[in-house]
């Protein structure tokens, strides 16, 4: 089946293309061409002219098991460990535990999907998420090795930093770890520990990095390693954000993640808005909107070594596309976007989320029952799977109707 998608603008993300469409092949899920309408397609999706097609957003850091709300354990803390202790001692943590893990994963997946995210990095041991990720409505990166953190506070995820990093290099996977998430003496040793293990390389993806010194950043840049920032979580826990201007000055590859909603943002759209505001507050100047787009598309694709398939709208790439309403200008549209500015989400050339007026298009992709109508943020939507039933089951596990702002659903219970 061949699909033709015609938005007002296409952002590749490095180039802006007008008055063209995207041909995609459902058989392999890939983009065939960006061109005029030159041959009949099985499905034609003609979008309003005030829409922009971006590569499907990539959330570079989440913990899907922590898909709950509200935030717990506000700082300032000196290290993540005191926040984690506060979380696990809280009544909310006990409340969350009533929900089976698979349903927490479903909540996290739908949280990401309705904000335009098509791929997420779920930082957790494989034994936790392996049984879930193929059953979710979004892509979860499968090929990675990991540590929890590189310090004495490490929760002992994986088989040890040296073993996990070696495995990453041998398989051309990313090695993912938290780094220097805090300011005490032990937290600040993270890069030194990585160097001792020989684990600071182009395969290394480090999250948070609040305590990174200039020397650390020089070492990271020299190694061509990657950094991920989660400013909402960082500010909630530590009342500061990472030294992003210093990261950018060294041409380090930087991506954006949400962390879990129990310390971080409710979705990538909130994360973008807070990043814009916090950067201006810290440095007295704006972070470029194009840079932010790169932080949720091509940069994480490079970091997680999936940039031959994801992160771009180009022929041969997987047809994961997020359609956003035009607001202000091309790049500021993602900064200004909220729930109802996500016009449509496409994965592998198939529509997985859209406004209800696209129902006839949905029916061409799915038999009845494989998608559902939902009211999200006061608008009727179509979405893959049965989100209404999932939410009712979650309420059943809890024994009450829980308001979760990352899924603003209207539902009788």
Where are these regions (language model features)?
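Glycine-enriched alpha-helix->loop->beta-strand junction motifs that scaffold or abut catalytic
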Residues: 171-173, 199-204, 219-228, 249-254, ...
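Metal-associated gating/positioning segment near the N- to mid-region
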Residues: 48-108
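Short, acidic/turn-prone active-site loops that include or flank metal/cofactor-
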Residues: 144-149, 231-236, 259-262
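Active-site microenvironment of metallo-dependent hydrolases
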Residues: 1-40, 81, 91-119, 124-125, ...
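Divalent metal-coordination and catalytic microenvironments
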Residues: 8, 22, 29, 50, ...
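Metal-coordinating catalytic core of metallo-dependent amide/deamination hydrolases
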Residues: 95-96, 101-103, 120-204, 211
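Catalytic beta/alpha-barrel core
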Residues: 203-213, 228-236
């Amino acid at each position: 089946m061949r699909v033709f998608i015609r938005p007002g603008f296409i952002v590749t993300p490095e180039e802006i293309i007008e008055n063209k469409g995207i041909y995609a092949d459902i058989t392999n899920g890939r983009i065939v061409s960006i061109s005029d309408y030159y041959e009949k397609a099985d499905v034609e999706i003609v979008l309003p002219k005030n829409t922009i097609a971006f590569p499907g957003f990539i959330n570079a850091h989440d913990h899907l098991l922590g898909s709950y709300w509200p935030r717990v354990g506000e700082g300032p803390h000196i290290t993540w460990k005191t926040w984690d202790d506060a979380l696990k001692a809280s009544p909310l943590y006990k409340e969350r535990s009533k929900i089976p893990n698979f349903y927490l994963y479903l909540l996290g997946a739908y949280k990401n999907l309705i904000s335009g995210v098509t791929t997420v990095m779920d930082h957790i041991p494989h034994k936790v998420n392996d049984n879930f990720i193929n059953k979710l409505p979004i892509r979860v990166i499968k090929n990675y090795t990991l540590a929890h953190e590189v310090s004495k506070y490490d929760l002992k995820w994986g088989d040890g930093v040296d073993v996990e990093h070696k495995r990453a290099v041998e398989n051309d996977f990313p090695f993912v770890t938290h780094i220097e998430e805090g300011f005490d003496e032990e937290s600040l040793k993270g890069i030194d520990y990585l160097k001792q293990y020989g684990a600071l390389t182009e395969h290394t993806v480090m999250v948070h990095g609040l305590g990174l010194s200039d020397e650390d950043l020089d070492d990271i840049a020299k190694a061509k390693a990657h950094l991920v920032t989660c400013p909402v979580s960082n500010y909630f826990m530590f009342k500061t954000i990472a030294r992003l201007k210093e990261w950018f000055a060294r041409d380090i590859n930087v991506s954006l993640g949400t962390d879990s909603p129990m310390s971080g943002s409710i979705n990538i759209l909130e994360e973008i808005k807070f990043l814009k505001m916090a950067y201006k507050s810290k440095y007295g100047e704006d972070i470029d909107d194009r840079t932010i787009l790169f932080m949720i598309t091509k940069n994480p694709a490079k970091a997680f070594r999936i940039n031959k398939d994801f992160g771009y709208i180009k022929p041969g790439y997987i047809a994961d596309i997020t359609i956003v309403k035009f607001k202000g200008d091309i790049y500021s549209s993602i900064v200004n976007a909220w729930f109802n500015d996500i016009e449509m989400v496409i994965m592998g050339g198939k529509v997985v989320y859209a406004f209800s007026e696209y129902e006839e298009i949905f029916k061409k992709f799915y038999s009845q029952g494989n998608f559902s109508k939902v009211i999200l943020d006061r608008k009727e939507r179509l979405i893959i799977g049965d989100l209404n039933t999932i939410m009712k089951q979650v309420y059943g596990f809890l024994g009450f109707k829980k308001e979760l702002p990352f899924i603003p659903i209207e539902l009788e219970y």
